[in-house]
A protein has these predicted regions:
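N-terminal acidic, glycine/proline-rich low-complexity segments
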Residues: 1-130
Length: 130
């Protein structure tokens, strides 16, 4: 039986691997990817999710931007990591990825409502779920 999941993450190299595994696992059906700021900025984590999806050619997964910052404290920035993506920001095929127009909170809500029994897998900060 296939398990429907949403991956809420802050993609660097580790979460990029998680996206690849979730897309390729025969028992998983990745319904959405929601991103947010973690050790990298929210723009960078979103870009990394798009790069990963473009690399594996699975362009039908909704991807959205989420929280820019933590709710309570200032974001701790890993400046050495934020200077560069760690992935390939110069990819020519990123234009084929259309970001979901909803923010991550709305995408989470809509996907959960439309997929009873879905599991939210979190690998980053939990701000989008707060």
């Amino acid at each position: 039986m296939t398990k429907k999941i949403i991956l809420d993450c802050d993609p660097g190299n580790d979460d990029a691997l998680g996206i690849i595994v979730a897309c390729g696992h025969q028992n998983l059906s990745l319904k959405a990817i929601t991103t947010g700021a973690g050790h990298l900025s929210y723009d960078r984590t979103f870009q990394n999710a798009c790069i990963t999806v473009a690399q594996i050619g699975n362009l039908n997964i909704p991807i959205s931007k989420g929280a820019k910052n933590p709710l309570v404290r200032h974001r701790l920035i890993a400046k050495v990591l934020d200077l560069q993506s760690g992935l390939d920001p110069e990819r020519n095929d990123l234009s084929s990825i259309t970001p979901d127009s909803r923010n991550s909170v709305q995408l989470l809500h809509d996907t959960i409502i439309n997929n009873p029994g879905i599991t939210v897998v979190t690998t980053g900060p939990l701000t989008n779920l707060s």
